[in-house]
Amino acid sequence: MEKKDLKPAGVFHYFEEICQVPRPSKKEEKIIAYLKAFGEKHKLETKVDEAGNVLIKKPATPGMENRKTVVLQSHIDMVCEKNNDVKHDFLTDPIETEIDGEWLKAKGTTLGADNGIGVATELAILADDSIEHGPIECLFTVDEETGLTGAFALKEGFMNGDILLNLDSEDEGELFIGCAGGIDSVAEFTYREVDVPAGYFCCKVQIKGLKGGHSGGDIHLGRGNANKLLNRFLSQASQKYDMYLCEIDGGNLRNAIAREAHAVIAIPDADKHALRTDLNVFAAEVEAEYAVVDPDLQFVLESEAARPKAIDKDTAKRLLQTIYAAPHGVYAMSQDIPGLVETSTNLASVKMKSGHIIRIETSQRSSTASSKQDIANMVRTVFEMGGAAVSFGDGYPGWKPNPHSEILEVAVESYKRLFGVDAKVKAIHAGLECGLFLDKYPALDMISFGPTLQGVHSPDERMLIPTVQKFWDHLLDILKIGRA
């Protein structure tokens, strides 16, 4: 199978086209310009708000003008993650895609099907006048991945739809009618620089090969967190050796489970062989623990040039102890929906910043507002006990399920008629923009669906090609039969 043969042709044409347009979160200028040019080319009413959200309107098929207006919605930014051995500039370089069996993936980077496939689907509908539908508004939001900025900034009256179809879900055959709310917590330690004594061996301890994944959709899988595993070894080593912590870095994005982390440490030269032995023993133990969910986990120890400075011992001790104690993963399962995570927390990243600051970013999610605040307060308490300054982001609301939704009834009936099986109606632990849309447009009738994606927010991201056709057929049928 070659890319030019992929079906539906229009969707994959536009997906490949937008893969040529850099669109990192908060750097969406090029894709916004692309969308404006697209609207002008097709002579469609197009507008952009102050945040950068784009709305393109398409009139109804003749005879369908009295149908309810449907908003098709996707976000235009993408998570930019790459493997360490891959050279790629997300600000300038296109995403290189390739076919692997029935899957489409990128070459060592995130694919951007989250949510590029939704964007491409909307463009294909806007460009094809043979598709039957009532009035359509295509909403393209900015910066979903790092703060839901576009959804927060959306003003009342920018769109005028009655129904909203969010195209940002990742399991074909599943219709989502609810999502978790979330909040970000940031802890900062201030440290002093101290001298590393002469005669100390300096080395880098690195963890890589973890699958990572989405901190909402994949948190229940029990995959390893590179920050937690690295910290576990460093804590062990610090108790055995006179260890200086010179550098620490792990994870990147608040909504991704950390895949890689490293630290540079210094210990007495006489202990370097024992340290390597300890790491080998530790690696064997942890690799056995994660053999099923993270079979490619690796620990690497490499010699480093001598570092003259390190984090002061007191701060380093408090940092390691606090990260060790900080919760990560599933905290509670839903009592209403079997198999749904209710509350979780993600220890996302550990970074050294200018001004002698070590910054730890975490994110908390819950379908219950009080539980979301409870788990955030738990994280805050742990870090404050360790002497860190803690701050919270604004947070965002969840989307309460409406099992009596009219558009849900249409989508369920359509799926059964097209494919002979029942669609699964679900809520999702990941955050969607839908909760914020309801704040501004409380009368909206909404569902979320999409083709099958795996490994989103990581270079393992891939899209199951046959599900794109099913998603497309289902969406067009909903637009055709949608009730007036």
Please annotate each region the language model reported.
Residues E2-W103:
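Acidic/His- and Gly-rich active-site-bordering loop/insert found
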Residues K7-V11, E342-G355, S363, F419-I478:
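Zn-dependent metallopeptidase/amidohydrolase metal-coordination segment
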Residues P22, E102-K105, E145, F152-R365:
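Midchain, well-structured core segments that form catalytic/ion-binding scaffolds
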Residues M64-T146, A151-D162, C202, K313-A316, ...:
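Active-site metal-coordination/substrate-binding segment of hydrolases
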Residues E65-N66, D269-D278, A369-I375:
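Short, conserved charged micro-motifs
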Residues I76-M78, L139-G147, S169-E172, K211, ...:
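Acidic, glycine-rich active-site loops and adjacent beta-strand->loop/helix elements
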Residues G157, R223-K240, D269-K272, K317-Y324, ...:
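His/Asp/Glu-rich mid-to-C-terminal helical/loop segments that flank catalytic regions of hydrolases
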Residues L340-A430:
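Substrate-recognition/cap regions that form aromatic- and gly/pro-loop-enriched pockets
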